[in-house]
């Protein structure tokens, strides 16, 4: 176990919807990688208890997915609220990455960051202001090089989504970045 300011923090949240003003976080997971995207450690995967009033406002898509993957039941049984989940996640991160040294990494992380700012501000502050958003690369590839499109499973559990994001970025890295020869 070594703290390193080059390590990357990957995060994924599952939420009851996309509007951070009314929807809530129901699952959080984190993974630490090195700069070459090798997994160093997996953080806690935490279902976050939410009142029934927050569960019932989920749209049809979220309800279907999270019933199928068992997350709704895990949320209803969870002993963690947002504050406890935030503390446990930060405790894990402190073992691997200094505060504000890692960009927030994942897919559509701007969306996760909005929810973190509202419900887990200490965790949101743990990240550097920059981000490594795999969705940006995916959108560019889909438009400019559609033959290289990467298909994801999209089971929508936080840890599985992180692993898919790392695999996806590794795919793009090998195809587009590792082939570039440059000199300083």
Swiss-Prot record:
<feature type="domain" description="Exonuclease">
    <location>
        <begin position="8"/>
        <end position="169"/>
    </location>
</feature>
<dbReference type="GO" id="GO:0005737">
    <property type="term" value="C:cytoplasm"/>
</dbReference>
<feature type="active site">
    <location>
        <position position="129"/>
    </location>
</feature>
<dbReference type="InterPro" id="IPR036397">
    <property type="entry name" value="RNaseH_sf"/>
</dbReference>
<dbReference type="Pfam" id="PF00929">
    <property type="entry name" value="RNase_T"/>
</dbReference>
<dbReference type="InterPro" id="IPR022894">
    <property type="entry name" value="Oligoribonuclease"/>
</dbReference>
<comment type="similarity">
    <text>Belongs to the oligoribonuclease family.</text>
</comment>
<dbReference type="GO" id="GO:0000175">
    <property type="term" value="F:3'-5'-RNA exonuclease activity"/>
</dbReference>
<protein>
    <recommendedName>
        <fullName>Oligoribonuclease</fullName>
        <ecNumber>3.1.15.-</ecNumber>
    </recommendedName>
</protein>
<comment type="function">
    <text>3'-to-5' exoribonuclease specific for small oligoribonucleotides.</text>
</comment>
<dbReference type="InterPro" id="IPR012337">
    <property type="entry name" value="RNaseH-like_sf"/>
</dbReference>
<dbReference type="InterPro" id="IPR013520">
    <property type="entry name" value="Exonuclease_RNaseT/DNA_pol3"/>
</dbReference>
<keyword id="KW-0963">Cytoplasm</keyword>
<dbReference type="GO" id="GO:0003676">
    <property type="term" value="F:nucleic acid binding"/>
</dbReference>
<keyword id="KW-0378">Hydrolase</keyword>
<keyword id="KW-0540">Nuclease</keyword>
<dbReference type="GO" id="GO:0006259">
    <property type="term" value="P:DNA metabolic process"/>
</dbReference>
<keyword id="KW-0269">Exonuclease</keyword>
